[in-house]
Amino acid sequence: MGIDPGLTRCGLSVVQAGKGRAVYPVAVGVVRTPSDMPVEQRLNKLFDAVEQWFDDYQPHVVALERVFERSNVSTVMNTAHASGVLMLAAARRGVDVHMYTPSEVKKSISGNGRADKAQMTRMITRILGLSEAPKPPDAADALALAVCHCWRAPLNHLVKGKL
């Protein structure tokens, strides 16, 4: 399961890893919360939505975008609050969470750690064989996180085993 955390829009996706680098899309969506709603209610709505996804798809692992510093402190705080709620939902179900920075995801998917949103959307559409690009960008980002983890998990497992 790939999650692009956000309080206004949170991208959610589920993919199935195949042999080699084959990855198959299962579901993608976005949870929206109104900005005029109190933060605690928005977080509760996000928690309930991700819980429903856990019920519906029973993912074995979550790939979550790591919060990084942006110029807007309020945005960073809201994203961090959302990430905490999402990690809590996974932890309550015993689902491991793996975090990736935006540049790690971009490098994995496009080969360029500085790829723009349009390039990332084109790449994830092509990689997953989608007939149209996922919208909004939060949905594409959630898929990219899931694919990134599918591709990196075997290597991460080997590295951990040897250290």
Swiss-Prot record:
Catalysed reaction equations from the record: Endonucleolytic cleavage at a junction such as a reciprocal single-stranded crossover between two homologous DNA duplexes (Holliday junction)
Annotated InterPro entries: RNaseH-like_sf, RNaseH_sf, X-over_junc_endoDNase_Mg_BS, X-over_junc_endoDNase_RuvC
One of the GO biological process terms: DNA recombination
Cofactor(s) listed in the protein's UniProt record: Mg(2+)
Amino acids binding Mg(2+) 2: 65
GO MF term (any one): crossover junction DNA endonuclease activity
Cofactor remark: Binds 2 Mg(2+) ion per subunit.
GO CC terms: cytoplasm; Holliday junction resolvase complex
Residues reported to bind Mg(2+) 1: 4, 138
Active site location: 4, 65, 138
This enzyme's EC code(s): 3.1.21.10
Enzyme class: hydrolase
Keyword Transcription: no
Source taxon at top rank: Bacteria
Subcellular location: Cytoplasm
Predominant subcellular localization, coarse grouping: cytoplasm
A Pfam family that the UniProt record links to this protein: RuvC
Keyword annotations of the record: Cytoplasm, DNA damage, DNA recombination, DNA repair, DNA-binding, Endonuclease, Hydrolase, Magnesium, Metal-binding, Nuclease
Family in the record: Belongs to the RuvC family.
Free-text function comment from the UniProt entry: The RuvA-RuvB-RuvC complex processes Holliday junction (HJ) DNA during genetic recombination and DNA repair. Endonuclease that resolves HJ intermediates. Cleaves cruciform DNA by making single-stranded nicks across the HJ at symmetrical positions within the homologous arms, yielding a 5'-phosphate and a 3'-hydroxyl group; requires a central core of homology in the junction. The consensus cleavage sequence is 5'-(A/T)TT(C/G)-3'. Cleavage occurs on the 3'-side of the TT dinucleotide at the point of strand exchange.
Matches recorded under PANTHER family: CROSSOVER JUNCTION ENDODEOXYRIBONUCLEASE RUVC (PTHR30194:SF3)
Subunit annotation: Homodimer which binds Holliday junction (HJ) DNA. The HJ becomes 2-fold symmetrical on binding to RuvC with unstacked arms; it has a different conformation from HJ DNA in complex with RuvA. In the full resolvosome a probable DNA-RuvA(4)-RuvB(12)-RuvC(2) complex forms which resolves the HJ.
Protein name: Crossover junction endodeoxyribonuclease RuvC
Naturally occurring in which organism (per UniProt): Corynebacterium jeikeium (strain K411)
Gene that specifies this protein: ruvC
